[in-house]
Amino acid sequence: MSRTPTEVADAVSEVFRGVFDQLAAWRTPIEQLLAASAGGVGAAAGGTGAGASSGEVRPVTLDTTVADLVLPRLEEDDPMLVGAGFIADGEVVRGKGVHFAWWLGPLDDNPVLGSTDGPTRLDLSTRGYTEYLRDFRALEWYRIPATTRHAHVTGPYVDHLCTCDYILTLTMPVHDADGERMVGVVGADVAVRTLERALLAAFLDVEEPLALVNEHGRVVLSTEPALQVGQLAGPGSETVPCTGTPFAVRVRPAASGS
């Protein structure tokens, strides 16, 4: 029995709901750690919490907390996520204006990092990404949550920093103890090819060709041969929103040529 486009849109929503729920689950202990640090309370196991005088969390404490949260998801047999972590802005990490507590999942013949058989820490300090560090607040994955105070999906785009592949970046704002100031984002990267493995069977179960597009009409995945990832799709005979996401399923989408 074939599916309807609405059922396919529901399947898309379910996948992204799972990632957003995971981000929310990670955000809570990170905010608790930062709040405890601001209050001068050592929040991490082993007495490695922040000092009362600074109100800042120690980098090692933050890194340990974030690693304990994200590594289990990156170590799954068939992980949905290819990267995850927390990016701190401002003066919440001792001795740092910005701090990337970010890990990459196992990589296969990556042109930048080679192949890895387990998660690795993203170390921007050794890779010459000074411009990236200087300008990251202007990037969509950070700028939109900072402006709206809501979770956001960026992409699809080619991640030249880490995976060198089409990805979607999901980010959620992390706030200070008062909940008034955003102090960073918790986030996760999903490779488009991983998303395709999770959803393609559902898309193929509809007789008409379909395309999953973002709010700008850019293709994430498609069963229309004329449409490739990243291409702009033209209007379709029907558009079905994917609830809780910026995506929609277009039925019989036209190729725009760009």
Residue ranges and their predicted role:
Residues V190-V219:
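Solvent-exposed, extracytoplasmic
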